Amino acid sequence: MIIQKGKEHLAKDKQKSNLYLRILSGIVLVPSFVVAILWLKPLFYVLMILVAIGMLSEWYDMTHSSIMYLLIGLIIIPIPISLLIFLSSNPINNWLIMLYFCIVWSVDIFAMIGGKTLGGAKLAPKISPKKTWSGLITGILSAGLVATLISFIPSFYIENYYFSNRIYLFIISCTLALTAQLSDLFISYFKRKFNIKDSGNIIPGHGGVLDRFDSIILTAPILFFINGLYL
């Protein structure tokens, strides 16, 4: 009994430590990408290319060098990142890209906080045992709120009407947040399939590059599609 309680206590301490590390990593990553997007665009391109290389490398290692899965990786990783680079090549989309990263990263952080705080039913226990429905809902609503608050910044401007209207913005942000979580589960499925917990350990609190940027896989195409509706 004492040993069991000790293990549970250590597990909780580890989870709390991972949460702090994840928040600290976000504090470093978010400003870095904001600066790159708004003022140092070549740096943003370099960062995204490095992200693509890192994701592909980890995907290759994770799937045990399987040719079939490598081909899947060559589709689901370069294409979404290319779409983000294409969108960011137009300066008028600077705020759009920055908002996008704030949404997909905030849902991840707040989903983890909500899940740890509220607990409750598991979202997909066989794929990602730690995810909960309470965390999902908390993350989605928080991401929508974060995006709405960002829209009050005086210099905030997105040409697309669906992003400049705060009601639509909240709905789109929640949609992207939900998709980000689905994208996370999508990659988690493959990690479970190949018996891997994290794709790497390069980013404290997150694991590998693929663990941190897996939300791009499904959300970037949706962002590109929605942005194109009004153009």
Swiss-Prot record:
PROSITE patterns attached to this UniProt entry: CDS (PS01315)
A matching Pfam family: CTP_transf_1
Principal subcellular localisation of the protein: membrane
Pathway: Phospholipid metabolism; CDP-diacylglycerol biosynthesis; CDP-diacylglycerol from sn-glycerol 3-phosphate: step 3/3
Entry's transmembrane regions: 33-53, 67-87, 95-115, 133-153, 167-187, 206-226
Coiled-coil spans in chain: none
Cellular compartments per GO CC: plasma membrane
The enzyme's E.C. designation: 2.7.7.41
GO molecular function, one term: phosphatidate cytidylyltransferase activity
Keyword annotations from UniProtKB, A to Z: Cell membrane, Lipid biosynthesis, Lipid metabolism, Membrane, Nucleotidyltransferase, Phospholipid biosynthesis, Phospholipid metabolism, Transferase, Transmembrane, Transmembrane helix
One GO biological process term: CDP-diacylglycerol biosynthetic process
InterPro entries reported in the protein's UniProt record: PC_trans
Membership in a protein family: Belongs to the CDS family.
Subcellular location(s) of the protein: Cell membrane
Domain of life: Bacteria
Protein name as annotated: Phosphatidate cytidylyltransferase
Catalysed reactions listed for this entry: a 1,2-diacyl-sn-glycero-3-phosphate + CTP + H(+) = a CDP-1,2-diacyl-sn-glycerol + diphosphate
Membrane topology: Multi-pass membrane protein
